[in-house]
Curated annotation (Swiss-Prot):
Record region (Disordered): 74-97
Misc: Partially overlaps DFN2.
Name of the molecule in the record: Putative uncharacterized protein YDR095C
Length: 136
């Protein structure tokens, strides 16, 4: 875990900029369902990386003392087209849980996008099918 100082904040912004590319933008749209990703890379590795950065030890300070690293939905192999939530803790539910009880990676990314926009830092994630302005 990185500490919550300004140096690690800047380091993470650089990391996030590298990880979240135009290629990833389509797979993290708010409308994307994990089990509908056919020819695209599942968002789980990216989601886990972002979850680590969202832990209370880091600069976002969104959750209570609980890492979100295991909060993501995973495919339930026994039920086609269904997902089951992984365990989550603390106030993570308040921010990330869907009404159906699961956690969508795109919701965390939406939070990050909103945060980045609030500090005028564009990371090229879009909630529409058109991936506009990816190189900004």
């Amino acid at each position: 875990m990185r500490s919550g100082n300004s140096g690690s904040c800047n380091h993470f912004l650089v990391f996030l900029r590298k990880v979240v590319t135009c290629h990833n933008a389509a797979i993290v749209r708010k409308t994307t369902k994990y089990n509908s990703l056919k020819h695209k890379t599942p968002p789980l590795p990216l989601a886990l990386a972002l979850a680590d950065a969202l832990s209370p030890q880091n600069f976002f300070h969104i959750t209570s003392p609980a890492s979100l690293s295991y909060s993501w939905r995973r495919a339930d192999p026994g039920r086609k087209g269904r997902t089951q939530p992984l365990p989550t803790q603390g106030s993570a539910r308040r921010f990330l849980h869907t009404p159906q009880g699961g956690v969508e990676p795109c919701r965390v990314i939406h939070i990050i996008t909103s945060y980045m926009k609030s500090i005028s830092y564009h990371i090229g994630i879009h909630s529409t099918k058109e991936e506009k302005n990816c190189n900004h």
